[in-house]
Amino acid sequence: MDLQYQSGFANHFSTEAVPGALPVGQNSPQAPPYGLYAEQLSGTAFTAPRHENRRSWLYRLRPSAGHGPYAPYVQERLKSGPFGAAVPTPNRLRWDPLEIPEAPLDFVDGLVTLAGNGDVATQAGMAAHLYLANRSMIDRVFQNADGELLIVPQLGALRFVTELGVIDAAPGEVVVIPRGVRFRVELEGPVRGYVCENYGPMFRLPELGPIGSNGLANSRDFLTPVAAFEDVERPTEVIQKFQGGLWTGTWDHSPLDVVAWHGNLAPYKYDLARFNTMGTVSFDHPDPSIFTVLTAPSEIPGTANVDFVIFPPRWMVAEHTFRPPWFHRNVMSEFMGLVTGAYDAKAGGFSPGGASLHNMMSDHGPDVASHKAASEADLSPHKIEATMAFMFESRWVIRPTKYALETSELQADYDACWTGFPKAKLP
């Protein structure tokens, strides 16, 4: 299927899979076209400020309210805030990539939580998951009432069949599924990647300040699907994440039956290669906030519930400057992943599909080999190519799960990358 998309970030879109399916001039007519059922999906409170208000009107074959009760569903490796099962540690942590199992595993059953913070009940905080899967979701869909999902593919392509349309994504792209939107994930082969579950306010573009009206992630490069529906009348399992637990119910039809919709709440994707990277053209390494793609704010201005930050291919031209990211202690907590290539502050040990966690005020920075190379490098203009690292950064301490602290992929010798620095020599 050759997919079509609508361009723009949080635009008010209008789309119909069947001509004439959208009502004209009102949202909820007495008799919608073709006998469709009108349903509003609200992503914010009715009275949220207009510039932040997000909702869409859906016109579907059957009302989504027509289903029976849900029952608990067990998935042991998926966890949610509050993360109290493991004692938080100030230690720097790094994980090798998790292997994709040979046994059949779909997207939902393949979710593994490494760390998180906050509490789903208070709609604050985030969780960092991995996904490992080798088969499509068959006659089952998923919805998350606890938060929106930012999905970062690392290995293999995925198709997201959602209530509001179909999105294809591959490594180098990201997909955001709003809270409550139902979807199915289809695969052509084994896949692996990362998920940021945002319990707080929805992701939005960061303010640009003195950068001006253009730069970083530009609105036009975000793609939202056009309406697409399926009329399937056979038992379909609907799995819902609610207050940290999973629940399952069986519907007598597919809930992906929205024929038309309009509004500004919808899933979308973004090609990270479109990011207009900013950097110094004189000296020093700017703060990594210049690499922010999306931000979900907290109640403190300028302090994020969670930021999504990337370290893409870019030119390094700073004069008389140590060019990689510097040594740092941060009031924010940083969970990092690597889609492809290498990260310029780590010469080894950080592999695509792996992850690291540097919590609040944990000392971190370049390893010995990277520091030596950058300190002695010829400072002619140099382009970092074939790389894509990223970071989920949050104002709260990110607590690793019990699984993350006990898995064999946790590197026992991570601290060793900072041993062997020679002492400075004073006159």
From Swiss-Prot:
GO cellular component, one term: cytoplasm
Active site: H285 (proton acceptor)
A Pfam entry, by short name: HgmA_N
Record-listed homogentisate binding positions: Y343, H364
Metabolic or biological pathway, per its Swiss-Prot or TrEMBL entry: Amino-acid degradation; L-phenylalanine degradation; acetoacetate and fumarate from L-phenylalanine: step 4/6
Reactions catalysed, as given in the entry: homogentisate + O2 = 4-maleylacetoacetate + H(+)
Binding site for Fe cation: H328, E334, H364
One GO MF term: homogentisate 1,2-dioxygenase activity
Signal peptide: none
Record has Cell membrane as a keyword: no
Quaternary assembly: Hexamer; dimer of trimers.
Similarity remark: Belongs to the homogentisate dioxygenase family.
Stated name of the protein: Homogentisate 1,2-dioxygenase
